[in-house]
Each structure stands twice: as C-alpha cells, then as structure tokens.
C-alpha cells in the first residue's frame, strides 16, 4: 500500500487515535494491574504458574486495562479538555467519535474474553463482576466521593481470579491480598488525583483527593500503612520464608520517600510519585518469588 495514499493515511490516523485511547504508550496502568495478579499467581501455584494461565492473565490484563482506558475517555469526554493533563486526549481534540470508542471497548472486551478459554468455569464466573467494575468505574466520578476506592476493587479482581484459575477455589489469603491491594490502589490513585486536584475542583469531578481535602496526604499514608500491614498479615498466614520479609523495610523506605515528595503537592511531582509505585509492586513480586523459591 502506498504510504502517501488517502486510505493509508486514514488508517494510520485511526490506528494512532485508537492506540492513544488505549494508552498503549503508557504502560504504568498495565503494570500496576499485573503486579498484584502476578503476586496471586505465584502464591497460588507455589512459584510455578502454568504458562498458558500466565499468558492468559498477562494478555487479558493488558486488554482489559486498554478497554478501561477507552471507556474512561468516553465517560470523561466533556471534561478532559478542561484538565491540563488530559487536554490532548483524542476526545478533547475532537479526533474520535463516541461510536468508535464504544466499538473499540467492545472489541477489546471480546478479545479479553477469549483469554478465558483455557481457564476454568470459576474464573469465567469471577470475570463478570470484574468486567462490571472495570466498565462502570469511570462513571462513579460523578456521584461517588471516593471513586478511587471503587477503582481499587476493579484493580484487585485479578487476585481472586488468579487463585480460582490455579487452585479452583479462593482461599482466605486471596482475600487478604485483595484487601491489601485495594488500599494500595487507593493510596497511589489518590496521589494521581492530587495532580489534577485544582482542575477537578473547577469542573466538579469527585475524587479522593478532593474529598480528603487538606488531609489527602494523611489519607495516602494511612492507606500505604494499611497495605503494608496486610502484606505482613499475609506473610504470617502463609508462613512466609525469610526472603518475603525483606520487602517490608524496603517498601517502608519507598513509602516514606513518597511522603517526602508529595508534601509539596506540586502537580508534576505528584504524577512522578504515582509512577514510582511500580517499584513497590516489583519489590513485592520479588519477595513473593523468593518466598516460593526458598519455601520449597
């Protein structure tokens, strides 16, 4: 195909728009979804997850995160132009139609559903509330004072699904990990919301940063503390090997550094601090991986 032909240019433009809607160039959301899913897969499988299951969750997570981003932009299409961080998104620039976004969301969800084929029926069943949470989260910002808590539920459903896929049931430790991840998500996404706080106040969007007001930093650190405490409880429940416990001082140090950074409430620093949570996810995965290795 001639790269200068109108058809090629049209297809290239649509592909660029769709990839931007999916945040394909910003993998942080996928990583923050994958880490807790991997924690669960490694714990449930004693460190040896089936490759087909691992691939299904990895690809499915990417696809559902992408679908969530598209429906989020659809839901926020009337607001993104007024927010500094989102003013260049496709809807804000008038580059995409509502029908396109909805069809792209449906297509991505269909592809994600295909990832369930090698998994058991319990996992299929648990995918239904996961899908509901993922697709409805963006609309909670209109009426729910802490939509980041709702996002925490959506971002944590990979945990019971992973246990269901590997073990055929969802044991108590899965729900401890679920609760821990809800708190972690609430912590880092409140920091994310702090970057947009001034704009959100102007347009009337509800976020945890707006709801917590001047206590936003205290709320973030309380959630971080609860997250780490529950990870310690999880370690006690599973009889974690010594390697697991090395994560706690490292994570506490990373959390303190986040506290020191967000005290300024500077927009860019808050955004960079949000990105830094990827390190916490990696540290805990390394600790769980090491636990399963040394526990054998």
Swiss-Prot record:
GO cellular-component term (any): plasma membrane
GO molecular function, one term: 4-hydroxybenzoate polyprenyltransferase activity
A GO BP entry: ubiquinone biosynthetic process
Pathway the protein contributes to: Cofactor biosynthesis; ubiquinone biosynthesis
Reaction equations catalysed: all-trans-octaprenyl diphosphate + 4-hydroxybenzoate = 4-hydroxy-3-(all-trans-octaprenyl)benzoate + diphosphate
Cofactor(s) of this protein: Mg(2+)
Main localisation: membrane
Membrane topology: Multi-pass membrane protein
Keywords, comma-separated and alphabetical: Cell inner membrane, Cell membrane, Magnesium, Membrane, Transferase, Transmembrane, Transmembrane helix, Ubiquinone biosynthesis
PANTHER family, alphabetized: 4-HYDROXYBENZOATE POLYPRENYLTRANSFERASE, MITOCHONDRIAL, PRENYLTRANSFERASES
Family: Belongs to the UbiA prenyltransferase family.
Entry-linked NCBIfam families: ubiA_proteo
Name of this protein: 4-hydroxybenzoate octaprenyltransferase
Source organism: Neisseria meningitidis serogroup B (strain ATCC BAA-335 / MC58)
């Amino acid at each position: 195909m001639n790269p200068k032909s109108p058809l090629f240019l049209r297809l290239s433009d649509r592909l660029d728009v769709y990839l931007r809607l999916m945040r394909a160039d910003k993998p942080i959301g996928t990583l923050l979804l994958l880490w807790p899913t991997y924690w669960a897969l490694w714990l449930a499988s004693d460190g040896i997850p089936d490759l087909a299951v691992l691939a299904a969750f990895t690809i499915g997570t990417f696809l559902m995160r992408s679908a969530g981003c598209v429906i989020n932009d659809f839901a926020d299409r009337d607001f993104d132009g007024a927010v500094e961080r989102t003013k260049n998104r496709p809807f804000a620039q008038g580059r995409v139609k509502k029908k396109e976004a909805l069809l792209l969301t449906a297509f991505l969800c269909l592809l994600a559903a295909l990832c369930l084929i090698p998994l058991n029926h319990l996992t299929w069943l648990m995918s239904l509330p996961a899908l509901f949470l993922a697709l409805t989260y963006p609309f909670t910002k209109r009426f729910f004072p802490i939509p980041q808590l709702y996002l925490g539920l959506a971002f944590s459903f990979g945990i019971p699904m992973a246990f269901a896929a590997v073990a055929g049931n969802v044991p108590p430790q899965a729900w401890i990990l679920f609760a821990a991840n809800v708190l972690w998500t609430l912590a880092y996404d409140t920091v994310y919301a702090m970057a947009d706080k001034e704009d959100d106040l102007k347009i009337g969007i509800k976020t945890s940063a707006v709801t917590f007001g001047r206590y936003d930093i205290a709320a973030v650190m309380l959630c971080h503390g609860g997250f780490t405490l529950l990870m310690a409880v999880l370690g006690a429940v599973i009889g974690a090997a010594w390697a697991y416990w090395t994560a706690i001082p490292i994570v506490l140090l990373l959390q303190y550094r986040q506290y020191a950074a967000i005290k300024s409430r500077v927009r860019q620093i808050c955004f960079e601090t949000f990105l830094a949570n990827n390190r916490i996810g990696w540290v805990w995965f390394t600790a769980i991986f090491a636990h399963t290795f040394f526990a054998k």
